[in-house]
Amino acid sequence: MAESPFKADIERAQKELTEKMTPGAIAYIPGSSVINKTGSWRVFKPEFHKDKCVRCFLCYIYCPEPAIYLDEEGYPVFDYDYCKGCGICANECPTKAIEMVREVK
């Protein structure tokens, strides 16, 4: 899977903020999972049904992490290395083209 186009920007911003802030339990950058793979502790994962998708991009827009990309045709592609399995994409999908299924490892 291709590397996130946002990764370099997030890493640079994180470095700048880290130098200026005192250490603590703060989420000071949204979309930090692109730097830290979080897919290994997911319980549910999104399963995509292309035949139901109307390419509204709501899943892409609402994903709190940059874990959804759009392919050349405008369909979502899920990067399971960074998907936390929160289900926001499935909840926002108006046609139920995304279903949350139990992760099997």
From Swiss-Prot:
Binding of [4Fe-4S] cluster 1, residues: C53, C56, C59, C93
The protein's required cofactors: [4Fe-4S] cluster
UniProt cross-references to SUPFAM superfamilies, sorted A to Z: 4Fe-4S ferredoxins
Cofactor note: Binds 2 [4Fe-4S] clusters.
Keyword Transferase belongs to the record: no
PROSITE patterns reported for this sequence: 4FE4S_FER_1, 4FE4S_FER_2
Keyword Thylakoid: no
Pfam family, one: Fer4_21
Record keywords, A-Z: 4Fe-4S, Electron transport, Iron, Iron-sulfur, Metal-binding, Repeat, Transport
Span of domain 4Fe-4S ferredoxin-type: 44-73, 74-103
Single annotated GO MF: oxidoreductase activity, acting on the aldehyde or oxo group of donors, iron-sulfur protein as acceptor
Binding sites annotated in the UniProt record for [4Fe-4S] cluster 2: C63, C83, C86, C89
Subunit text: Heterotetramer of one alpha, one beta, one delta and one gamma chain.
Protein name: Pyruvate synthase subunit PorD
UniProt source species: Pyrococcus horikoshii (strain ATCC 700860 / DSM 12428 / JCM 9974 / NBRC 100139 / OT-3)
Protein's gene: porD
